[in-house]
Amino acid sequence: MGRRFIQTLILLVVLGFPGLPIMAETGNGVATDQAKWIISSGTSASLPSGSLLSLALALERGAETVWLDLVLSKDNQIVLLTDTRIDQLTDVKEIYPDRSRPDGSYYSFDFTLEELRGLSHLPAAPSGSVSATSLFRSHLPVTALDDFLGYLDIVFTELAARPTLICTLKHGWLHQQEDKNLGAIVLQALEDYQSTKANASVVIASYDPEELQQLAQSRGAGQAEDIGFMQLIGSNNGEEVQRLEFGTLQPYSYDLLFTRFGLKSVSSSADSIGLDPQAV
């Protein structure tokens, strides 16, 4: 493993899981005058993660790195959502009450981009709070990756520097069951983006080691070689990755990745590692 790989691993273990905002702040969540946002997914006391408004606020506050959770729509468009199951994230139950699957859940890849854009994020604040009530009355639409990148280009001149984008592939294994290759589509989109933005800093992150290895092997030449790869490690509860074994889905175990062999395998495809707190 290279020195950069080891240093990044230590940094992420110390800071904690970068899927949450990492910043200097007071106990009540209010940033101090000395606060400096390092990594943010846009989550705040009232704004849901991945909404354009929350990401704009993170950039305005000086976030140097923006964490983007990505899923696919029915028409293979990349959307900013923290989960493929969208009934806990949006008002999809109200807009499309008859579109759930037999398990009762609503999935991003059952809706076109146009349909997803018509949905509103549910407020991050507890139900009944002033901020939650105010947000619920407004329309905070689901955002496509292209929309965010377009917004970033517009405000770039107002920023101190173009932020690093950590693009996290959410539930690639579940997309595969729908004959959708989330990783390949995201990689192509980011390669196209980097080809026109020479100073763009982009990282693709995944909880699935096999998915990341396949992407690393298929990465193109030229500027796309500058795209970084981050191996995320979560708990063994199957929340992020599952494998089909003997006809049933089973939680993926990360135990092997904590061995010398596992780390060597990861270092062949990843530039860095991000650990969930419960995995430390």
Map each language-model feature to its residues.
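Bacterial N-terminal signal peptides that target proteins for export
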Residues: 1-9
